[in-house]
């Protein structure tokens, strides 16, 4: 499981940072990639990665500001050509209005996509658990931005315990159907009368990962709720230390506020993104150091950076 940041800037493209988009790579888990936001130029950023567009099966939009959605029509059109050998349907999750935006853009431009797009739109009344599969659950809450904006919490369901094959061999259990029964939790009796208890040969379930992705927002308790005990919290950091007033006025957060959220939520790791173009390399390093005074395990991410979860 990996996160790859396709765009880490705020507002408009800059020389060092493109606008918002990140990919959650779940290739080992379900052979899919989930994208969060799709700002202008996202498909160009994807070309710099190993991501195959047809593997992107779900897109989660935080809100409808242009720096988070202007890349969608182009990406959806290009996905048609790049997925010509294997067309795969696509689910788009986001605030009410995302369906109208996408379909209008495709209609006006005369674009046709040879795959199905399934839209899932949300407002205040329909948030909470918004999606569930056999391996993942996704939750969403409203944040505190200048327009309706959502944050997402991706929860991997606990992984089944693994079978200790070597211990079974040592116990004289013949390889074959009995292994399968024990793996499924069944106790088995051997020919010599010994009872093999499945629980003695299966490890405890492994807790699944939690990834929280916070869209544009002021400091809010909703972010703490979404980030509770998260393995990774991705939080916007449009502004720096001392910019709290301007951040609040524009519906954004500072690096220090993001660190406070991570601390209050008990998150394990904080990744700062959505950085104003006025902050260059040295500034970003200082923002990271400042945030670390509140939450130590923090990193300011760069475009195309990959983070293993």
UniProtKB/Swiss-Prot annotation:
Species annotation: Streptococcus pyogenes serotype M5 (strain Manfredo)
GN (gene name): rnz
Keywords: Endonuclease, Hydrolase, Metal-binding, Nuclease, tRNA processing, Zinc
Catalysed reaction, written as an equation: Endonucleolytic cleavage of RNA, removing extra 3' nucleotides from tRNA precursor, generating 3' termini of tRNAs. A 3'-hydroxy group is left at the tRNA terminus and a 5'-phosphoryl group is left at the trailer molecule
NCBIfam families: PRK00055.1-3, RNase_Z
Family designation: Belongs to the RNase Z family.
Gene3D superfamilies from the UniProt entry: Ribonuclease Z/Hydroxyacylglutathione hydrolase-like (3.60.15.10)
Keyword Disulfide bond recorded: no
Function text: Zinc phosphodiesterase, which displays some tRNA 3'-processing endonuclease activity. Probably involved in tRNA maturation, by removing a 3'-trailer from precursor tRNA.
The organism's place on the tree of life at top rank: Bacteria
Binding site for Zn(2+) 2: 67-68, 216, 274
Record's protein name: Ribonuclease Z
The protein's assembly and partners: Homodimer.
Active site: 67
GO MF entry, a single one: 3'-tRNA processing endoribonuclease activity
Cofactors (names): Zn(2+)
Note on cofactor: Binds 2 Zn(2+) ions.
Leading EC class: hydrolase
EC number per UniProt: 3.1.26.11
UniProt: Zn(2+) 1 binding residues: 63, 65, 145, 216
């Amino acid at each position: 499981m990996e996160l790859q940041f396709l765009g880490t800037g705020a507002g408009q493209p800059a020389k060092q940072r493109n606008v918002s988009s990140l990919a959650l790579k779940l290739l080992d888990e379900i052979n899919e990639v989930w994208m969060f936001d799709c700002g202008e130029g996202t498909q160009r950023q994807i070309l710099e990665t190993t991501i195959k567009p047809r593997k992107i099966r779900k897109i989660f939009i935080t809100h409808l500001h242009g720096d988070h959605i202007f890349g969608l029509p182009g990406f959806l059109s290009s996905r048609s050509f790049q997925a010509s050998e294997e067309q795969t349907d696509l689910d788009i999750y986001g605030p009410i209005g995302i369906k109208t935006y996408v379909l209008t853009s495709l209609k006006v431009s005369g674009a046709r996509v040879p795959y199905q797009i399934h839209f899932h739109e949300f407002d205040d009344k329909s948030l909470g658990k918004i999606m569930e599969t056999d391996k993942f659950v996704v939750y969403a809450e409203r944040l505190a931005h200048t327009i309706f904006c959502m944050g997402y919490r991706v929860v991997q369901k606990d992984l089944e315990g693994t079978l200790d094959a070597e211990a079974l061999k040592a116990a004289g259990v013949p390889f074959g159907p009995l292994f399968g029964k024990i793996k499924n939790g069944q106790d088995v009796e051997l020919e010599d009368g010994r009872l093999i208890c499945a629980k003695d040969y299966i490890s405890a379930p492994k807790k699944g990962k939690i990834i929280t992705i916070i869209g544009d927002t002021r400091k809010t308790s909703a972010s703490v709720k979404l980030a509770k005990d998260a393995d990774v919290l991705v939080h916007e950091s449009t502004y720096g230390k001392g910019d709290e007033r301007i951040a609040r006025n524009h519906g954004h957060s500072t690096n220090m506020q993001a660190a406070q959220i991570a601390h209050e939520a008990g998150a394990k790791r904080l990744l700062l993104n959505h950085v104003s173009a006025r902050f260059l390399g040295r500034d970003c390093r200082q923002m990271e150091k400042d945030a670390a005074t509140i939450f130590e395990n923090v990193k300011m991410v760069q475009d195309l950076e990959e983070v293993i979860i």
